[in-house]
């Protein structure tokens, strides 16, 4: 970027963000060596006494990426983004000296090596790339294992067998012809198993207040329940703006994020259900529906009541029933880390102080206090409207678990949980939460808001999936942007790294998204401009490419309302905030883009391989990237993508491949157009 770099230090979560000076090398780069414990590490470079705002895209210190070796970026909580890397444990050493060169790693108690998906037991091992010629799982019978994933210096080999598998060995013939035997191993008695229904779904996120106003008669109720009525640090200020109502197409005002209401409601959702079904949607994730003090709903006033601005319980039950009749399952958004000011326990603490039985539900620093004063109690993000709950308190835990059970009994099919890593004793709480919820409703789908790749939440005892920004934003979005820094080969390696880290059961249930209510819109991220801009044909093409990649991955593709319409929307750092949440202007939808999303959903129904839990890397060259979906053999799908505006070619695997969209068969080579993609279906058996 032409900047004269005078000093660089490394600061991160591994050293409590203390300074670790880096040294300038002869080639002009800066480096430092540090020994780290296994796990996910967040960090930034401190350059010339300044922090880069975004380690993945900073015009001052390096664009598109300050550290080209970073595996992705995650929100730093201050309007910027930290880079992160996952530090892998050292590979276990096999007992035989001759096998050391393999770096063979397999542990049947680790879910990434053994889990159940699609009714089969997946058994995998890792080895150094290029060292394994063939491998077999032996358990009375001999089952060939096949190369599944390749990235960096590692490979993953895999086989799927009956879940009734008993004791087994893994035999490997290395590249020199030597044979090695590992084991015996015993699979876990109750391996982590995927919910079979999840991976067949097509997801859609609904921010209800901005989805559609089906009943204007309830609009005024938003003002009656708004935070303003409880926040004395706000409502005692005569010059402060008040919450207000807007017409559906009114421009965003300064408090667009939170207290400008447009009237979206459950009646509007019911009116749009036929549209969702036509688009192929079969899973809806609602942002918070319960009584709260804002448009976003993350400041809960009553966990057991529907927000009056949306409707009531009777209307919610009708909405769930009608969705289920159309084959659409529904998740609700749960906020256990903090409440709003109107929550009964907080109001009791406000009035009674230490005498309140709920005093220890919060972290009160002084009393009496003014509600809304963030210096008086711990609050999420320092916002006085969001007092933090003490989830280490047994009473708080019991309340939150019973709330979750109540809504599952009511008819919801699963739960998305907000900021799970910020709870007190989070892992302990969610282990108990999962046990009780799965005992009540074993098929409930449990999703955690974690932005980076972090398998610690996905060991079979807490969550079924994370919100996979680590796939959607850190991999798919960066590939869809194009450019040499995120080539097809890098895209494929990053995908392989993710799927090697996670159990196959986790891959099968992946909640895969690129954008949401917390990010800029996909079109904006791909160069399509902001809320009122007219996007270029290239930007729309990149959206189509990103969607085609996401729909081809294991798990559930999830898009934010209106993404299929081709809407832009920024996430600015100054008012008006959260333009990506502007109401969906349905009359401005782009029919050709809606047709694209509908087509992708139809292909997932028509091609069983696209809903398989299995992804196998094939090839990445320059702008082209290709992976295989499903078990090898007739019907497997080769998904091929080109992120360049120039045409590109790819050598195909042996055999005949039928284009899923066109009546055409390919052999030998495929030419892809600008920003093109293809799903090719194998005709006949695979040739190994």
Regions found by a protein language model. Name each.
Residues 506-535:
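Active-site clefts of carbohydrate-active enzymes
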Residues 1-40, 48-88, 129-164, 173-183:
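Aromatic-rich carbohydrate-binding modules that target alpha-glucans
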Residues 201, 208-283, 288-410, 428, ...:
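Substrate-binding/active-site clefts of carbohydrate-active enzymes
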Residues 77-130, 193-196, 205-207:
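Non-catalytic, glycine-rich low-complexity segments
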Residues 317-332, 337-355, 402-405, 413-510, ...:
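Active-site-proximal helices and loops of the catalytic beta/alpha 8
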